[in-house]
């Protein structure tokens, strides 16, 4: 605070620092210097500091000179100060004593007032207790007087035949009884109240007995006035729940016992539905008057209704639930999932229809909040039902995802049973015969598990070696392989009996690989259809975030798409190996023409047709299962790879022929014989030229067949180079003819 009040002298504007920096609480020399160095050199900073230091010294001298007289007179002004202070001590002590005395007097006065106020409050409370007890006695005597007078009048036939009068008297008693109850609660613990309590208990018992009898009489005679007076009386004494319980026991329970019969439900084909229909008839037929009086019916007049009652929620519904739980326990048994699903669906439909009989939305909310409602829902063991369904689906799927790949049923759009079973499992999860709204989260998780399991299965297939057996033979288990990961996770058993036991790998045929790719493509096409099946089910429970569902299915599509390249590569490699297995027969062409006197070739070799036969079979045999683009991709890849190897083979053959030809020429020249004559003994084409011509015919025929496959020869890698190679050889062969 002192620093903030000090005014430092102002320095020149040329200073490289702010003078107020020195007065800050967090002033730091190092920070100050480093900050100034950013603007000026150290020499300039030093000069500015020295300049300001001189200004400070000058200002300090001026300040001392200005107040010099006050500094000198300071000791003089303090002379006699001790004496003056001593003179003040005596009167201050007297003042202190007077203040303490006054404080004591005031405290005593306050204490006396508090004591009197406390006594008055105690007297007031006791007076209120006495008044309440007096009121209790008066109410008891008044009620007893009314009851006595009513008893004396019961001899009169006129009064006895007037239930309305009885209802009015009960209302008067109830009003007085209500006040009696209020004052009795306020007077709890008073000795006099204990003496009066037996009389109060007698009044209570008689009042409840009269009300029950009157209510039953009104229900039996369908007298709206009696029912109205009786229910109003129950409401007055805050016993509405007793009235609802009475209706449940006397009116509802006998009907429930007659309707809910287990033998009828099990023997009748639609026994459960018939039973629920009869239960739904109870409210409109037997509770009409009660609902009109209490405002539970649409036609009720507001002025004549007695609020505070809900007989459907508090009387009918608890008795229905109790009857179902006690007399029909098999209803909730999940052992038979199909029967359980049917019973659950019919029961939930019954609950929805019962809710529509509620008089208002508030009544529906009360019904859903009722303990019996929660008890009824908990009785349905949905987790056990789902577990049974889960095992059914998982077991069926795992039975198809085995080492032995079986064909799908004839009517299926899929080729393999594994794919057919996967799609049928997905559809079954959301079928009307299995789906339950409360299990939607479990069913969605099972859907993703099925898709993931199929993706793992396909990845495993892509790792299998390709066998040379036909598709019919490959259906038989070639070897016993290890089991794949199961959708049930943890139910597989250890198949190995020891560390020395080997597990051979299961092979797969090329046709089966083609089927896998076709099924993958088909399944990806049908996943949007699955989304359309799922949407209505999710809308049923109010779910709106369909983008997340769609994204999850797109992820599954991506995982399926990621499997295709490896499968395609495997198929292309196998086709290429098969194709080149025949194309390498070009190595046998020299043996066919050398020293055999065969005619000049005019047609292509048969090995070309043999090499292309698998490709034509692929195109014709699977065009209804695969997209043409996929087939074309495989054909192009197969031909590109095999043609490249074929090019190398033909090149080697032509080079070998050329070397043989040159070697023979050199040999003949060395023997000084007749110069080598390229023509044959009969003056025709030489064996070497026949070889060249045959290879040219083979390659030309190969190009023609490629076009028949729907491909352009220019799209096949190495084919252009191969065509140029044999064209040059053909030109050489024809050029040497005479």
Swiss-Prot record:
Keywords: Congenital disorder of glycosylation, Disease variant, Golgi apparatus, Membrane, Protein transport, Transport. GO terms for molecular function: protein-containing complex binding. It is found in: Golgi apparatus membrane. It is a peripheral membrane protein. GO terms for biological process: glycosylation; Golgi organization; intra-Golgi vesicle-mediated transport; protein transport; retrograde transport, vesicle recycling within Golgi. It comes from the Eukaryota. Residues 483-500 have a biased composition (Polar residues). Disulfide bonds: none annotated. Pfam families: COG2_C, COG2_N. The keyword Transport applies. Residues 474-504, 668-687 are annotated as: Disordered. Component of the conserved oligomeric Golgi complex which is composed of eight different subunits and is required for normal Golgi morphology and localization. It is linked to Congenital disorder of glycosylation 2Q: A form of congenital disorder of glycosylation, a genetically heterogeneous group of autosomal recessive, multisystem disorders caused by a defect in glycoprotein biosynthesis and characterized by under-glycosylated serum glycoproteins. Congenital disorders of glycosylation result in a wide variety of clinical features, such as defects in the nervous system development, psychomotor retardation, dysmorphic features, hypotonia, coagulation disorders, and immunodeficiency. PANTHER family: CONSERVED OLIGOMERIC GOLGI COMPLEX COMPONENT 2, CONSERVED OLIGOMERIC GOLGI COMPLEX SUBUNIT 2. Required for normal Golgi morphology and function. This is Conserved oligomeric Golgi complex subunit 2. It comes from Homo sapiens (Human). The gene is COG2.
């Amino acid at each position: 605070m002192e620093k903030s009040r000090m005014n430092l002298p102002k320095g020149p504007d040329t200073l490289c620092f702010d003078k107020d920096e020195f007065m800050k609480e967090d002033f730091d020399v190092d920070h100050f210097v480093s900050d100034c160095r950013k603007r000026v050199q150290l020499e300039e900073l030093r000069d500015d500091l020295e300049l300001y230091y001189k200004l400070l010294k000058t200002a300090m001298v001026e300040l001392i000179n200005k107040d010099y007289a006050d500094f000198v007179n300071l000791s003089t002004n303090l002379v006699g100060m001790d004496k003056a202070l001593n003179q003040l001590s005596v009167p201050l002590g007297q003042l202190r004593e007077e203040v303490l005395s006054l404080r004591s007097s005031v405290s005593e006065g306050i204490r006396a007032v508090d004591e009197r106020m406390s006594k008055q409050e105690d007297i007031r409370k006791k007076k209120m207790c006495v008044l309440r007890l007096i009121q209790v006695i008066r109410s008891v005597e008044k009620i007893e007087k009314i009851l006595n007078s009513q008893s004396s009048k019961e001899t009169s036939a006129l009064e006895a035949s007037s239930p309305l009068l009885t209802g009015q008297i009960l209302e008067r008693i109830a009003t007085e009884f209500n006040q009696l109850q209020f004052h009795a609660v306020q007077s709890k613990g008073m000795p006099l109240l204990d003496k009066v309590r037996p009389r109060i208990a007698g009044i209570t018992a008689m009042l409840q007995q009269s009300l029950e009898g009157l209510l039953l009489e009104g229900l039996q005679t369908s007298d709206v006035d009696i029912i109205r007076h009786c229910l109003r009386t129950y409401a007055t004494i805050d016993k509405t729940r007793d009235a609802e319980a009475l209706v449940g026991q006397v009116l509802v329970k006998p009907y429930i016992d007659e309707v809910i019969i287990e033998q009828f439900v099990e023997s009748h084909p639609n026994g459960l539905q018939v039973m629920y229909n009869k239960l739904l008839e109870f409210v409109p037929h037997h509770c009409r008057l009660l609902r009109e009086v209490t405002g539970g019916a649409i036609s009720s007049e507001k002025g004549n209704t007695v609020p505070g009652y809900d007989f459907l929620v508090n009387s009918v519904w608890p008795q229905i639930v109790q009857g179902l739980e006690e007399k029909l326990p098999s209803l909730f048994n999940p052992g038979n999932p199909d029967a359980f699903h049917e019973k659950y669906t019919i029961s939930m439909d019954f609950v929805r229809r019962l809710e529509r009989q509620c008089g208002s939305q508030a009544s529906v909310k009360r019904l859903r909040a009722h303990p019996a409602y929660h008890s009824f829902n908990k009785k349905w063991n949905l987790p056990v039902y789902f577990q049974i369904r889960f095992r059914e689906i998982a077991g069926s799927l795992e039975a198809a995802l085995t080492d032995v790949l079986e064909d799908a049923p004839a009517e299926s759009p899929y080729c393999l049973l594994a794919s057919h079973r996967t799609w049928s499992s997905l559809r079954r999860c959301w079928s009307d015969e299995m789906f339950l709204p409360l299990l939607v989260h479990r069913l969605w998780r099972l859907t993703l598990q099925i898709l993931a399991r199929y993706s793992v299965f396909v990845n495993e297939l892509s790792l299998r070696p390709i066998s040379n057996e036909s598709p019919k033979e490959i259906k038989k288990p070639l070897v016993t392989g290890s089991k794949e990961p199961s959708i049930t996770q943890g139910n597989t058993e250890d198949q190995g009996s020891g560390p020395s036991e080997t597990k051979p790998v299961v092979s797969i045929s090329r046709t089966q690989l083609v089927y896998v790719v076709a099924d993958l493509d088909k399944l990806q096409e049908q996943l949007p259809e699955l989304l359309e099946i799922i949407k209505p089910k999710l809308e049923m429970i109010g779910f709106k975030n369909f983008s997340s569902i769609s994204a999850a299915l797109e992820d599954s599509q991506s995982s399926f798409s990621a499997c295709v390249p490896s499968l395609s590569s495997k198929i292309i490699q196998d086709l290429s190996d098969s194709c080149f297995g025949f194309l390498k027969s070009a190595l046998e062409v020299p043996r066919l023409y050398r020293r055999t006197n065969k005619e000049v070739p005019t047609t292509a070799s048969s090995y070309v047709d043999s090499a292309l036969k698998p490709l034509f079979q692929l195109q014709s045999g699977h065009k209804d299962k695969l997209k043409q683009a996929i087939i074309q991709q495989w054909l192009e890849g197969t031909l590109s790879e095999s043609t490249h190897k074929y090019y190398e083979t033909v090149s080697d053959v032509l080079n070998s022929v050329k070397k043989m030809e040159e070697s023979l020429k050199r040999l003949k020249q060395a023997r000084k014989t007749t110069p080598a004559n390229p023509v044959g003994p009969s003056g025709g084409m030489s064996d070497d030229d026949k070889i060249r011509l045959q290879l040219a015919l083979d390659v030309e025929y190969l190009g023609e067949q490629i076009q028949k496959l729907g491909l352009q020869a220019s799209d096949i890698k190495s084919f252009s180079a191969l065509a140029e190679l044999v064209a040059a050889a053909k030109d050489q062969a024809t050029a040497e003819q005479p």
